[in-house]
Amino acid sequence: MEIIVDITKEIEGYEDVVPEKIESYIKEIIAKEYPPEDRPLYISLLLTDNETIHEINKNYRNKDSATDVISFAYNEDEENDGFYEVLGDIIISLEKVKEQSFDYGHSYDREFYYVLTHGILHLLGYDHIEEEDKEEMRKKEEEILEVYGYRR
């Protein structure tokens, strides 16, 4: 199964954020967790700042604050007859990830890959609205992070 990951980095600095490593991580998780498709899967990732994610959060989610990650899953009810099977878009604020890594006492890598995993799982249909779903999603996040050595 071909998986296409389109990564855009709109923020200066953060040289330790390596697109090739991120792309590989996304592809491995999607390949393990998503049923095989006959056509290529497409996912986009935007790495940005607090100001941009705040604006997106306000405009699309009616929340007037910056956040760490926003996922827009492609609507499964809509017909997708294009060349790609579009899973959706993930937007991550690298500034917010840095803040949270300090707040929670995690390494920057651990926090970044936690947030990225969270976004990927949303695209795969996980959510955390109901407590039972939240527990299932948290368990899956920790399982994935453990495989890659990102421990708390």
Located regions from the model:
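Periplasmic solute-binding protein
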Residues: 121
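An acidic/histidine-cluster motif and surrounding catalytic segment
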Residues: 1-113, 124-152
